[in-house]
Amino acid sequence: MGTDITATSEWQALARHRDEIGETNLRQLFADDAARGLRFAVTVGGLYIDYSKHRVTAETLNLLVDVARAAGLETKRDAMFSGEHINTSEDRAVLHTALRLPRDAALTVDGQDVVADVHEVLDRMGDFTDRLRSGDWLGATGERITTVVNIGIGGSDLGPVMVDQALRHYADAGISARFVSNVDPADLVAKLAGLNPATTLFVIASKTFSTLETLTNATAARRWLIEALGEDAVSKHFVAVSTNAKLVAEFGIDTDNMFGFWDWVGGRYSVDSAIGLSVMAVIGRERFAEFLAGFHLIDEHFRTAPLEANAPVLLGLIGLWYNNFFGAETRAVLPYSNDLARFAAYLQQLTMESNGKSVQADGTPVSTATGEIFWGEPGTNGQHAFYQLLHQGTRLVPADFIGFSEPTDDLPTADGTGSMHDLLMSNFFAQTQVLAFGKTADEISAEGTSPDVVPHKVMPGNRPTTSILATKLTPSVVGQLIALYEHQVFVEGVIWGIDSFDQWGVELGKTQAKALLPVLTDAEPPAAQSDSSTDALVRRYRSERGRTA
């Protein structure tokens, strides 16, 4: 049987503390401690992380750390970094942290020199992208490649597309990237629009080279290329990120242009592996190395810092605090940077696929709520969409605000005297302030507001936020941000006793889709389905496609 964390004395002490502090108000917490904004903050690498606007006291944090220790967080953290098989349902090591180890590090797992393997692939990626960026690699007609189209899904898409947008200012070799993931043909058609086959390179990202959506899109892309340039062009315009040399070769890709990765890398943790090939093609191997160094900086902090001063630990524990003791089900991620527009979508997979589990690692039911629903949009777009609910709604939604002191782009304000970036960041600081402290009925009445309107204008405040401030959005900072959330996921998963590194919940739907495809397409009318809803939907679909229902 797995450990029931809720039965421990540490958890029960935390539950009593929750009852004692009740709805402790942030106004009062700041009034009681003039230095709270400085004391409840930590600087790690390029990230200044302010967690003072949370409903926590020093005692809360101490009790949360006690729970983490009761769950064996430090031991399990060390087990992950050393390559033990902590993914128990698949009997695998979990070594995404090895992807960013420096060349002189040492790590042997299951008899294999992991660091040497990682850097062999990174070197091959670097050599290939150097040729691509310099124009040494030419397409079938002798023209330079100007567009890389990454075809993948899930972790083979969400990471690269997010990082590509985040680091668009570091594109410096005349190469741009597009990303195709959805098996809806509209995705591929839109991404191929306006492209010249002679200057386009496809990266097919599939570990097994058998992922249905990816191979369907890859085959359609191959057909598009062959129609323009002929069969022999495939080897000059397709490369693979895969471990299945046989299927890669059968597709027409030279296996010398196949870049591998390992079973100990989960898809949602793989953007810093060969899955990042499209990113490296755009920003270059040196910037990609900076990206990896950012991950490693946070890895080392997480591995070595005391739990009480460990940023991923503290943020993971605070997330658990709201999830399990306040009934909060979601967390908003609100980057005040349009270049991080895809960050919330990336975190959705990272967090929800990892911790969306209802059984513990040993198969027994969990004893408390697990997983956070991540969502969000860049500021200030979100302010004009859903912040109303954050400020005055009945649901508690903790939020992470991410901002930068230096802009990647800046323009003057309407009157020509100010900076649009300053305007953006004034909203960042104002929103966290208003969410925390609100505005009372007395304060609103004192402004001469009509009594009938006062209740509608009251801002209750006491809405929790984390503020993450960095100097600038650089490759290193992007790596730091990703690793910060990766390790939060681990912290919460350990305390809940779940396996954060499998994803069995996505498998049954894939199997069922394969079974249903011929039901949709066969010439003969289908047999009755196992439920009346699916049966009616299938028959309506067939009828509207002109097939016998």
UniProtKB/Swiss-Prot annotation:
The active site is at 353 (proton donor), 384, 510. Its EC number is 5.3.1.9. It catalyses: alpha-D-glucose 6-phosphate = beta-D-fructose 6-phosphate. Pathway: Carbohydrate biosynthesis; gluconeogenesis; Carbohydrate degradation; glycolysis; D-glyceraldehyde 3-phosphate and glycerone phosphate from D-glucose: step 2/4. It is an enzyme of class 5 (isomerase). One of its GO terms (molecular function) is monosaccharide binding. Residues 537-549 have a biased composition (Basic and acidic residues). Keywords: Cytoplasm, Gluconeogenesis, Glycolysis, Isomerase. Catalyzes the reversible isomerization of glucose-6-phosphate to fructose-6-phosphate. Belongs to the GPI family. This is Glucose-6-phosphate isomerase. It comes from Mycolicibacterium gilvum (strain PYR-GCK) (Mycobacterium gilvum (strain PYR-GCK)). The gene is pgi.
